[in-house]
UniProtKB/Swiss-Prot annotation:
Organism this protein belongs to: Neurospora crassa (strain ATCC 24698 / 74-OR23-1A / CBS 708.71 / DSM 1257 / FGSC 987)
Reported modifications of this chain: Phosphorylated in response to DNA damage.
A GO molecular function held by the record: 5'-flap endonuclease activity
Biased composition (Polar residues): 242-257
Protein name: Structure-specific endonuclease subunit slx4
Subcellular localization: Nucleus
Biased composition (Low complexity): 86-104, 152-166, 300-320, 589-620, 647-672, 811-832, 862-881
Length: 1013
């Protein structure tokens, strides 16, 4: 019966190929998933290798897992073995048959007792022999039971969907833990991790020789890496080189060794616990990097590399540069180092200070090194640079900061060396020059207080250094005279001078026989001579224009760089200037001056009579340099030069001052003479508009726009002021005019008989009957000359006149404005029309071109009527004929031009002239008009403002409307109590002009403005 049982087992064996076929089909679909990006490439020479590992490694892992864990459940193991076997690239038939028999042997113990296990070897052999004929022999039910048992592997490979139905219906599927099922789905790369752990399953791979070859290659390196690279996420954050190697080896068989023990636990470790593993990795990695850097730094600085130095030096290194004492290396530090107050330095600190100056000193720490390192190492570091510390101790202590007095501060500044400023411009390759300049500055500071700019002579041993001072452009260009004008000195090139024989130089060195030696202060005498020359040049306007200096022959002698070359230029002086008086000169010879500045070397040497040159020479001066270099000092600055000029002015006044004094004396004499004689009439046509308006305001009149009206009014006022004193001069002009006209006596008598009180102030009213007569005369002249003046404006284009010249208007105008000595041409009735036209056309060819006066000219300080203005004074140069570019005849007959220009006066100016003839009744009327307008009630309608509001808003006042309002009962003049006659438009117009109110006439029918009534 037992034999029959075995036969039954054999009869059921043909069903096993069906299982392998199903597994093979599932594996064929599964291979597409395993050959993705995560699958490792399989070499072409590999034999028996799957997608992840070889068959030998699978059997070896099964043995290892059997040792670590007992067999828990054999039902799920064949499901994990079959995919790995099916997915192999080159599957050997022997290996497949072996695995299938093991799967069958593992499934049978679940149904039958374990007794028939002893015959497994026989069954496997039978199955291997009958492997090809198994597929055709199939039966219904027995294979279904075995398919159900092997079904749990199908969901893992995701091969077929209908396999899920028997999985839920069978009770055997529940024996598989959910954790294992999840691990089977999650990690597809771990099918060979848990093979069958039965001892029978581990027996077949032993005869395979490939297992012994792969064991030392795959297993041993994996164990070493697990020890060295203990959590894998440690090396992930930084891009280290080691991480790339780890990533490359993850899909290898070594990863299978680290993760397989617990599939579900490994999933949580690799994905859920990454943040916990990163924190310890940062600490360990920082320590490693810190140690490496510390080892490199300590190796360069010290000889002893101890563990304590490695730990302490990185912590204390940032606190080390707190007290480094460096030397000042910038320009500001160098300039302020001498004035900085330094703290006292101890000896202990000074010994360590040299260490901080070098780069090695920044690595070691003073306090911790002294505590950790032995004493011998410390003394060696200090003994390396002992000399540097001693040099720093020998530096002089800085002076205490004190508030010095001005004298002591100047003395201290004079003792300092110039690092910047003008002295740096003089620095050349020759250092003797700068050294000599400093010495001269120091000696100048110790001079006497009476003459602070006097300094002791400085000896120059080197001629080259002396010659460098000859090109001081700043002082020469900036030299100015007492009036503030620049000196136009001639520039000489000392480098390209002509060589002079020795005998000439020796002869020049000899002192002059006829010139006495200079006494106590030779410098002042030289300065006086220089100031005299400067005064000649600056005070003479003609000499300034011609750029010449009147005087004797000037000899210019200069030395070159070598001291043997010189330039001598001789210029013949012209005869004495006709404008400026000749100046006495002391016969002198060119003698080298001692201790004189560059700006004060203008001298007048030997005098000789010579003919006048054809061309005016340039301004020349003698620039005599010291031949023996015994006495020399640097040229003074502009400030010093100005002080020297002030001192020279105190001792010897210049020609300009003498000339000013003479002018003052002449003015005093003229004033005294004017008191006795009548003053000459001022030339108002020469005055500017501003001067004319100022003179008119001094008489109390309002400003006038037209220039001719201002001149006419001033002349009338001047005639009324002088009174009878001017009767003679005006009488001459009247007689000449009366010969032709004979009808101007009433007007001129009324004008000339007026006298004004001389002591009245500005703005005071003219009192007395004389002023009334003057007003009447002015009004007569203005009213009588309205029409003729209007016609005279176009006299050249108008029709020829008849005997209208006998009328008084033109003659009265000419007579009132004629005060010059030249007589007017007699225009009698017998004069022909052509002669009159030519005389008038010659009178007004063009108006005079007046020069715009300078702001310095101010005539208000002196009496404008006492004398003529400075530009028109007879003793001034040039005369008025040269000042104004007009013909001489025009200036002689300027009153004719003035008469012609008066014809351009408009009605506005005439009305201003009529203001002077205001009667008391008109003044009272104007007062009531002002009161009526200002006291009128304010309007409540913004569109109709009152007259006062219109005036305040600068609205033009219509004369007809204002006159009608003033004459309205109960509104204008009637409201303020005016009892006189009604106001007319002409009176209202004059009131507006007196108050400066803008007025207009109402337009006529043709759209034109009516000017007169």
């Amino acid at each position: 019966m037992a034999h029959n049982d075995t036969i039954d087992i054999i009869s059921s064996s043909p069903e096993f190929p069906d299982i392998s076929v199903l597994v093979a089909k599932a594996a064929s679909k599964k291979s597409a998933l395993r050959t993705g990006s995560n699958a490792t490439p399989i070499p072409s020479d590999a034999v028996g290798l799957g997608t992840f590992t070889s068959a030998a490694s699978i059997w070896h892992l099964s043995q290892v897992m059997d040792e670590e864990k007992p067999t828990k459940n054999s039902s799920s193991r064949p499901a994990k073995e079959t995919p790995a076997i099916a997915t192999s690239v080159s599957t050997v038939a022997v290996e497949v048959s072996a695995t299938t028999t093991t799967a069958v042997s593992e499934e049978k113990p679940g149904k039958k007792p374990r007794k028939p296990r002893k015959k497994k070897d026989e069954t496997t052999a039978a199955v291997d022999e009958n492997a090809p004929p198994k597929p055709p022999a199939r039966r219904g039910r027995p294979p279904k039971q075995k398919d159900v048992e092997g079904q749990p592997a199908l969901p893992k490979s995701k091969a077929t969907k209908p396999a899920a139905k028997p999985r839920a219906s069978r009770k055997k599927a529940e024996t598989v833990s959910k954790h294992f099922a999840a691990s089977a789905h999650a990690s597809t790369a771990d099918p060979p991790e848990e093979p069958s752990k039965n001892p029978a399953a581990s027996k077949p791979p032993k005869p395979i020789p490939v297992q012994n070859i792969d064991e030392p290659v795959d297993l041993e390196p994996a164990a070493r890496r697990r020890l060295d690279w203990t959590p894998p996420p440690d090396d992930r954050p930084p891009p280290a080189a080691g991480n790339s190697s780890v990533v490359k080896e993850l899909p290898s068989s070594t990863t299978a060794h680290t993760e397989p023990p617990v599939a579900f636990g490994k999933l949580l470790d690799t994905y859920g616990c990454e943040p916990e593993t990163i924190q310890p990795s940062e600490g360990t990695k920082g320590n490693v990097l810190g140690k490496r850097k510390l080892i490199e730094m300590v190796a360069t600085t010290t000889t002893t590399n101890t563990a304590t130095d490695k730990l302490t030096s990185p912590e204390t290194s940032p606190t080390k540069p707190k007290a480094p004492k460096k030397k000042p290396r910038t320009i500001t530090d160098l300039a302020t180092a001498a004035y900085r107050i330094q703290d006292p330095v101890d000896d202990s600190i000074s010994t360590v200070a040299p260490k901080q100056d070098t780069l090695l000193g920044y690595i070691d720490v003073e306090d911790e090194d002294a505590a950790v390192k032995p004493g011998g190492a410390k003394t060696k570091a200090v003994s390396k640079k002992p000399a540097k510390a001693r040099v720093s101790k020998k530096k002089p202590e800085p002076r205490k900061q004190l508030l010095l007095s001005p004298h002591s501060a100047l003395r201290q500044v004079s003792g300092q060396n110039f690092v910047f400023g003008t002295s740096s411009q003089l620095v050349t390759e020759d250092t003797d020059l700068l050294r000599a300049l400093h010495e001269s500055m120091k000696t100048a500071g110790n001079a006497q207080e009476s003459d602070p700019f006097m300094s002791s002579p400085v000896k120059f041993s080197n001629i080259a250094s002396r010659s460098k001072m000859g090109n001081n452009k700043l002082w020469r260009v900036g030299a100015r005279d007492e009036d503030g004008d620049l000196l136009d000195l001639e520039i000489f090139d000392l480098t390209e001078a002509v060589e002079v024989p020795e005998d000439v130089v020796q002869q020049a060195d000899k002192p002059a026989v006829d010139v006495p030696e200079r006494e106590a202060s030779p410098r002042k005498q030289v300065e006086r001579e220089a100031e005299r020359a400067i005064g000649i040049f600056s005070s003479d306007p003609v000499a300034t224009e011609r750029l010449t200096i009147t005087g004797p022959e000037t000899l210019i002698s200069t030395l070159s760089i070598k001291g043997k070359e010189s330039v001598r230029r001789t210029t013949k002086s012209p005869p004495p200037n006709p404008v400026a008086p000749p100046r006495e000169r002391t016969p002198q010879r060119a003698r080298p001056p001692s201790r004189d500045s560059l700006s004060s070397r203008l001298r007048s040497p030997q005098t000789e009579t010579s003919p006048r040159p054809t061309t005016p020479p340039r301004v020349s001066a003698v620039l005599d340099l010291d031949y023996d270099f015994d006495d020399y000092e640097p040229p003074p600055s502009n400030q010093e030069h100005y002080q020297l000029l002030e001192q020279s002015q105190k001792t010897s006044p210049s020609k300009t001052q003498q000339r000013k004094q003479q002018q003052q004396q002449q003015q005093q004499q003229q004033q005294q003479q004017k008191k006795r004689d009548p003053p000459p009439r001022p030339k108002y046509e020469v005055f500017t508009d501003a001067q004319l308006s100022r003179e008119i305001a001094s008489y109390g009149f309002k400003p006038i726009k037209k220039r001719a009206a201002m001149i006419r009014l001033l002349e009338q006022c001047w005639e009324s002021k002088t009174g009878a004193a001017t009767g003679k001069s005006t009488g001459l002009g009247d007689n000449t005019l009366q010969e032709g006209t004979g009808s101007l006596e009433p007007a001129h008598r009324s004008i000339n008989s007026v006298a004004v009180s001389p002591d009245r102030g500005r703005g005071q009213t003219i009192q007395g009957a004389h002023m009334q007569e003057a007003r009447a005369g002015i009004k007569m002249a203005a009213s009588a000359t309205k029409r003729p003046r209007k016609k005279a404006a176009v006299a050249s284009a108008s029709a020829p006149r008849t005997s209208t010249m006998e009328n008084p208007p033109k003659a009265a105008t000419a007579a009132s404005t004629s005060t010059t000595t030249a007589p007017l041409p007699a225009l009698s009735a017998s004069t022909s029309k052509r002669q009159r036209r030519t005389s008038l056309s010659s009178i007004r060819p063009r108006p005079p071109i007046l020069e715009i006066p300078d702001s310095d000219i101010d005539i208000s300080d002196s009496d404008p009527f006492a004398s003529s203005p400075p530009v028109s004074s007879p003793d001034a140069s040039p005369p008025a004929s040269q000042l104004f570019s007009t013909p001489e005849k025009h200036h002689q007959d300027h009153k004719h031009d003035l008469a012609a220009e008066m014809s351009l006066i408009t009605d506005c100016e005439e009305s201003l002239l009529d203001m002077t003839s205001r009667t008391p009744s008109e003044a009272d009327l104007f007062k009531h008009i002002t009161e009526a307008i200002t006291t009128a009630p304010r309007t409540t309608n913004p569109s109709e403002p009152s007259w006062h509001e219109k005036i305040l808003m600068y609205d033009p006042i219509i004369l007809e409307e204002l006159t009608a309002w003033l004459n309205t009962a109960g509104k204008g003049l009637d409201r303020v109590g005016w009892e006189g006659c009604e106001a007319g438009t002409e009176e209202v117009r004059r009131w507006c002009e007196s108050k400066g109110v803008g007025w207009v006439w109402r337009e006529g029918n043709r759209g034109q403005v009516r000017k007169r009534f």
